[in-house]
């Protein structure tokens, strides 16, 4: 594309082959012949004096190829970022970035954050890509987003983690469901923390087996020797779990951050529709919340300022 900061064609072809693990698919994407792709790889291997791919029986990156892939991928991200910044200047745009975040946390975090951020940076354009942390990690490595709000993000040498806070799981249960299983005198006692063993007969909505939150809940239940005997529903969407709880159908275990909207619900609803929120005793599996960006890309002032505002607003919300 005209105006791009160009990367050597050999490296572009190498990236395609490394990602497709197929000369024919790489050729199709590059609109060249398979022989042309082969020639580019051969020239690059000769230049570096090493094999970048092995074929036994399928094409794979060698150790040298993996090192080169990481380096060239970062070069591509830096190149694209520089091109984007230059275009913004020439087009008169003050700046833009793309952030990854989960749907549930976007609803809780963004209204307050963007209200304050807009006061200082009214001309910055922000796009939001909504998905789970594992997907957002890949999008960042591929250069498709600039940063993301991660929950227990994996440790990767290309990631820079900016710690925000630790979130903890809380039990939520409607007043109507609570009264079916507990006496009024239990309410005051539970406000300081509940033992999940006392809720073994209460119906719960739980998370999918593959979900990260399901894993830490299972670890706690296993360690404490607890079994929930009534789990009619499984869904990883916390918003749905909260709505089922509000309806009095099931209880749920959700991060404290995502239960914050229930406080507003409790202030506005009738007393019989209140939802109780309890901390869980001995639940030693915090959710580490970070803002994550690519270590190799220098962040402009307006993104660093966004980090600071997110941190300040989260601390206000959680206290």
Annotate each PLM feature.
Residues 9, 34-35, 84, 90-121, ...:
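N-terminal winged-helix
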Residues 11, 47-48, 68-90, 306:
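Alpha-helical linker/hinge and terminal dimerization helices associated
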Residues 15-32, 58:
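Short helix-boundary/capping micro-motifs
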